[in-house]
Amino acid sequence: RFRFTLTTNGVLLNDEVQEFVNREMDNVVLSIDGRKEVHDRMRPFRNGKGSYDLVLPKFEKLAESRNQEKYYVRGTFTKNNKDFSNDVLHLADLGFKQISVEPVVGSDEEDYALQAEDLPEIFAEYDKLAAEMVNRYHTDKDFNFFHFMLDLTGGPCVAKRLSGCGSGTEYLAVTPWGDLYPCHQFVGEEKYLM
């Protein structure tokens, strides 16, 4: 059986698409970077206007329609929001339970690129998140943060950690144009086009 995950920026999400996603997709990734100012800076429309106010209510509705399961909100932190624990907590305060905010991947020359000297600040943010997760445990504001989800009982996640990310064994990225890549990180790189 194939499992399908859809990643969406939410712009074209409507009731019909939501119904399809809930019926056909095993998982859905809702791409939002956290606080309004952070999201709008990195995800503007062509006219320069931010997309946060348009996509947030759609994402809240979709997460609820999936009973806060089988989805996650996925953001990216950059040099411009090294205080990304605030973005994670913003999303949790909005009611999202499944959250992943990950470091940007890109050229070191980009003005938003993270550098080695940023690591102490980044590590401190992870410490803040860990403490806040403990504080919120068993409250109505608790949440799962993807990077802290460890399987200490030896379940199926152990095999995944040993075999890697799944690229080439159980994972395939499909672009809107039907191009196939072994991983979403390789999309657009001609040498990885399958």
Name what the model sees in each region.
Residues 1-36:
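Conserved SAM/AdoMet-binding glycine-rich loop
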Residues 37-60, 64-177, 187-193:
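Radical SAM enzyme [4Fe-4S]-AdoMet core and its adjacent flexible, acidic
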